[in-house]
Amino acid sequence: MFESNHRRLWLGGTVLIGAMLGLLIALPWFPMASSGKTVQLEFLRSEPDQALLFFGFPGCGEICPIAMERLHAIKSNGGFPIPIQVGLVNIAVDLPAFTVSEYAHSFDPEFAGYHLDQGKLRSLAQDLGLNLPATEGGISTSFSHPDALFLLQHVEDESWRLKQIFSATRLTRQQLLKSL
């Protein structure tokens, strides 16, 4: 009797500790910006007035290909119900600017790639509550980064309002339709 109770307590404690560690490890990757926040995005066109922004890099071996393929699949299978800009913001600032553009176009010719300098990238990530690890000195293909996909709406001039944050690797067309 004592042994079975002890074993249950041990298993329960192990599960609880594992869940807490998982949360502590994953928490920094979750964006903390709330919808309604306004950010300055001088690199986006004012039309169409809706945009989906994803942060990643060419050569990513895990998250980026899945996210970009998912966006392409949603666009190809029924499309977006309204015109939307889809952009990939490069987090590997040491790569040449044309590389991110070519990478985005490889998934869909209408997808755009944006290469910001380190200061603008950090500022934008901070505005959106995105915790990006330091990337100086290059990024390996096994580098893990958040899969946050930001839905934004143009307000005026270079101002965009954050409408919704999605998981880019798990986004469905239905989720997107509900938010537009």
Where are these regions (language model features)?
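Cofactor-binding loop segments of dinucleotide-utilizing enzymes, especially the Rossmann-like FAD-
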Residues: 57, 89-91, 154
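N-terminal targeting signals for export/organelle localization
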Residues: 1-41
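Short, low-complexity, Pro/Ser/Thr/Gly-rich segments in the mature regions of secreted, periplasmic
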Residues: 170-179
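Short active-site neighborhood of thiol/selenol oxidoreductases, capturing the structured segment around
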Residues: 44-71
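Short secondary-structure boundary/capping segments
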Residues: 42-45, 78, 140-142
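Extracytoplasmic
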Residues: 47-48, 81-86, 144-147
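Structural microenvironment flanking redox-active thiols in thiol-disulfide oxidoreductases
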Residues: 66-124
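Thiol/selenol-based redox catalytic cores and closely related redox-interacting motifs
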Residues: 110-111, 116-171
